[in-house]
Amino acid sequence: MKHFLTYLSTAPVLALXXXXXXAGLLIEINRFFPDALTFPFFSF
């Protein structure tokens, strides 16, 4: 039971860190390549 409670306390922390890193990566990509996500849809 102790290991299960440890898992419940660390999994949200790891998910938050992964989500923050993914969001930071998208922010940095959009800083260097602005409108890269919408550019192919409006290039006609």
UniProtKB/Swiss-Prot annotation:
GO BP: photosynthesis
Top-level lineage group: Bacteria
Xref: InterPro entries: PSI_PsaJ, PSI_PsaJ_sf
Transmembrane regions: 7-27
Membrane topology type: Single-pass membrane protein
One GO CC term, this protein: plasma membrane-derived thylakoid membrane
Gene3D superfamilies given in the database record: Single helix bin
Compartmental location: Cellular thylakoid membrane
The entry's keywords: Membrane, Photosynthesis, Photosystem I, Thylakoid, Transmembrane, Transmembrane helix
Family membership: Belongs to the PsaJ family.
PANTHER family (alphabetical): PHOTOSYSTEM I REACTION CENTER SUBUNIT IX, PTHR36082
Purpose of the protein: May help in the organization of the PsaE and PsaF subunits.
Protein name in UniProt: Photosystem I reaction center subunit IX
Organism: Thermostichus vulcanus (Synechococcus vulcanus)
Taxonomic classification: Bacteria, Bacillati, Cyanobacteriota, Cyanophyceae, Thermostichales
